[in-house]
Amino acid sequence: MITTIAFSAFAIASVIWMSVRTVRDHRAAMAERRGLLDDAARLLRDARITFSADHFPILAGSLADGRQIRAELIVDTMVCRRLPQLWLKLTLFETILRARPRIGALARPTGAEFYSIVHEMPRLLMPPPGDTALLMRGDGNASDRQVERTAAMFASLFSDRTLKEAAITPRGVRLVRQADEGQRAAHLLLRQARFSVTAIAPEIIRRTIAEAEVLSGFLADDEAVPGRRDFRKNAQRFLFQADPT
């Protein structure tokens, strides 16, 4: 009898301890998650950080030339038999609409990339040859020469296996790259998306911005679309649209 009571008390105490530990670990993870882009914020002018519904940070700021940058972190658990992915999605917004087509590429496509804008482009294009499987699409307004030049650029960019998506549009450019991969034990045993990264290194943000600037100046005339207004005054509105590009 005494043994049964003691065992029951131990079991109850263990459950309480595990519950308290789980809550404490969750709170610590949320606090750590919110600081992932703090170091990177120093790279931008007028940097400000807001938070998504799942407490991941969204960094917004500007470059020296006034163009706006938005960087956000996205958790992807959509693909079976693959560890959860933490993607860094960075968008560079032009101050004026550019006279260029929408064109982009997505690496190792599965069809489950809910964050992708390449999937929204209607025209299928021939991707460049290479070791990485690419889905290349556009809006149908690119010339053959533009498609060839962009394909060559993508072949170079996607030699980096961390790069998932690159897209050029009249309003801006976007890059998506892997920031971290989920912990195997947490995923297999607990079916949770836990990541080891405690901060996104400023070097990763700096490199991604540099690549975005190259893409921004890559296609055609780099001129404003005739009759369209200057977007500098309205940049903040575009920063917080779901898909501004």
Language-model segments: what does each one mean?
Residues 1-9:
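Feature marks short, highly hydrophobic, charge-poor N-terminal signal-anchor/signal peptide-like helices
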Residues 8-17:
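Alpha-helical membrane-embedded segments
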Residues 16-40:
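Transmembrane-cytosolic junction motif
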Residues 21, 38-41, 45-51, 57-58:
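Membrane-cytosol interface segments
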Residues 28-30, 46-47, 165-167:
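Short, mixed-charge, low-aromatic patches
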Residues 39, 43, 72, 157, ...:
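Residues that form generic nucleotide/phosphate-binding pockets
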Residues 50-57, 62-64, 79-85, 91-245:
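Charged, low-complexity intrinsically disordered regions
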Residues 68-77:
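Long, continuous compositionally biased terminal/linker segments
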